[in-house]
From Swiss-Prot:
InterPro entries recorded: EzrA (IPR010379)
Organism from which the protein derives: Staphylococcus aureus (strain NCTC 8325 / PS 47)
Coiled coil regions in record: 99-138, 190-223, 271-300, 350-435, 471-550
Functional note: Negative regulator of FtsZ ring formation; modulates the frequency and position of FtsZ ring formation. Inhibits FtsZ ring formation at polar sites. Interacts either with FtsZ or with one of its binding partners to promote depolymerization.
Pfam family, one: EzrA
Name of this chain's protein: Septation ring formation regulator EzrA
């Protein structure tokens, strides 16, 4: 037993030793990778990057930047790369002692140092590339500025007449660029690449602005010297022609406004000659806005005249229509009020319309007189005609509505008479059906309903013979009688159907009287109720009796009655 225990312990120890050596082998691979990485980053070309700056002017800002990067390279080597060898050596020693965690910590520190060293290299590479790119951009901008300088100078010299009095100032501004180009060369020669960039970039923007001025100035001069004076002249003579045609344009104030605009235009060229183009554009925009306002007023007058010519005849027709309709209404009201009741307000409205129409005709005559003058402000005439058109349209609508009302009175009377005749005819027809039916007697309530309808009809007939007739009241009464008649007819139909049905049930049940005493008793009661005009109750008792001996037969009998 002891032997087995000893063997087990030995096996465990051997396994543990094997595991330790296996782990140390894995950790050894990590250390070897760190050594390989160290060998790779030692070859990073810090010096080659810096050597690219030697191709530039190693002075001034360039020299300062070069020295700073060289110093950073030395510091990075001492701070990040030099300790790596020691960290790797310590990791190997600790690994030999099987101190895995401590060995891993040393390797991690070594990798962090190498990461920092690589980052330092990347930063140096970016800085060098940035300096080289800035040098290249500076040279490109400088070459562009030299070309622009020569072209602008040549343009002013060759096309001096296009720039007017601004040509001298343009030449002066262009000449200022030459010493600034030379200053760039000095900054570049001194290695001050950042100052050189800021200087040449600012110079390029100023040249672009002056170039835009040179493109804009000929347009401004052409607008100032030719286009606007031409528009002033066209507007002046155009208004003169319109006045000859009969337009009143005093409110446009053409002469005074044009004189004011000419004065304002005279200040524009001095602004252009001083290269104050923003102020010059503002003044020109203001002049054009005022011109547009004048053109809008004139165009409004021309359109107003066309509109006046189109609407004048329409308004004339509408006024005549209103007057004729008013006369017709006055005549018709006098006739209608003898036969029909008419609200006094309707008659007053017709008289009021007459006064309003006469007033509108007077206004229209004044407008026509105004239009016959040698100078007419058509915009005012248009407004006045619009006022007339709106009012005469309202009057015509109201008069037409009133006329339709008068016509409707006759139609309503005829409709009421027709409805009354139909009521009388229908009433007699229904009553005859009641008398000719199998009823033992006409129920008293139908006699009462018939008498009520007769009374209402006589009352309405008396109102028809009276004059003037209040058509609305009469129509309402006839409508009420029609409702009474419908009720009379519906209830009569119900009674007639129930009477036939009750009679059929009793007749059918007679076959069971001998054999079923209870049926005989029920049918006797149903006959008694039938004679007393209680048809619904008679039906209930007869149905119960028949269903007790022949289920479902009552439904068959009812269907036959309905078909009849």
């Amino acid at each position: 037993m002891v032997l087995y225990i000893i063997l087990a312990i030995i096996v465990i120890i051997l396994i543990a030793v094997g595991v330790l050596f296996y782990l140390r082998s894995n950790k050894r691979q990590i250390i070897e990778k760190a050594i390989e990485r160290k060998n790779e980053i030692e070859t990073l070309p810090f010096d080659q990057n810096l050597a690219q700056l030697f191709k530039l002017n190693l002075k001034g800002e360039t020299k300062t930047k070069y020295d700073a990067m060289k110093k950073d390279t030395v510091e990075s080597t001492n701070k990040y790369l030099a300790p790596v060898e020691e960290k790797i050596h310590n990791a190997e020693a600790l690994l030999d002692k099987f101190s895995f965690n401590a060995s891993q910590s040393e390797i991690d520190d070594a990798n962090e140092l190498m990461d920092s060293y690589e980052q330092s290299y990347q930063q140096q590479l970016e800085d060098v590339n940035e300096i080289i790119a800035l040098y290249k951009d500076n040279d490109e901008l400088y070459d562009k500025c030299k070309v622009d300088y020569r072209e602008m100078k040549r343009d002013v010299l060759a096309n001096r007449h296009q720039f007017g009095e601004a040509a001298s100032l343009l030449e002066t501004e262009i000449e200022k660029f030459e010493p600034r180009l030379e200053q760039y060369e000095v900054l570049k020669a001194d290695g001050n690449y950042v100052q050189a960039h800021n200087h040449i970039a600012a110079l390029n923007e100023q040249m672009k602005q002056l170039r835009s001025y040179m493109e804009e100035i000929p347009e401004l001069i052409r607008e100032t010297q030719k286009e606007l004076p031409g528009q002033f002249q066209d507007l002046k003579y155009g208004c003169r022609d319109l006045k000859v045609e009969g337009y009143d344009l005093d409110h446009v104030k053409v002469d005074s406004t044009l004189q004011s605009l000419k004065t304002e235009l005279s200040f524009v060229e001095p602004l252009i000659s001083r290269l104050e183009l923003e102020e010059a554009n503002d003044k020109l925009a203001n002049i054009n806005d005022k011109l547009d306002d004048m053109y809008d007023l004139i165009e409004h007058e021309v359109k107003a005249k066309n509109d006046v010519e189109e609407t004048k005849d329409i308004i004339t027709d509408n006024l005549f229509k209103a007057k004729d309709m008013n006369y017709t209404l006055q005549t018709e009201i006098e006739y209608v009020r003898e036969n029909y009741y008419i609200n006094e307000s309707d008659a007053q409205s017709v008289r009021q319309f007459e006064n309003e129409i006469q007033s509108l005709i007077s206004v229209y005559d004044d407008i026509l007189k105004e239009m016959s003058k040698s100078a007419v402000r058509y915009s005012e005439v248009q407004d006045n005609l619009q006022y007339l058109e709106d009012h005469v349209t309202v009057i015509n609508d109201k008069q037409e509505k009133l006329q339709n009302h008068l016509i409707q009175l006759r139609e309503d009377e005829a409709e009421a008479e027709d409805n009354l005749l139909r009521v009388q005819s229908k009433k007699e027809e229904v009553y005859r059906r009641l008398l000719a039916s199998n009823l033992t007697s006409v129920p008293e309530r139908f006699i009462i309903m018939k008498n009520e309808i007769d009374h209402e009809v006589r009352d309405v007939n008396e109102q028809f013979s009276e004059r003037p007739i209040h058509v609305k009241q009469l129509k309402d009464k006839v409508s009420k009688i029609v409702i009474q008649m419908n009720t009379f007819e519906d209830e009569a139909n119900d009674v007639l159907v129930n009477a036939v049905y009750a009679e059929k049930l009793i007749q059918y049940g007679n076959r069971y009287r001998k054999d079923y005493s209870n049926v005989d008793k029920s049918l006797n009661e149903a006959e008694r109720l039938f004679k007393n005009n209680r048809y619904k109750r008679a039906i209930e008792i007869a149905e119960q009796a028949l269903e007790s001996v022949e289920p479902g037969v009552t439904k068959h009998i009812e269907e036959e009655v309905i078909k009849q």
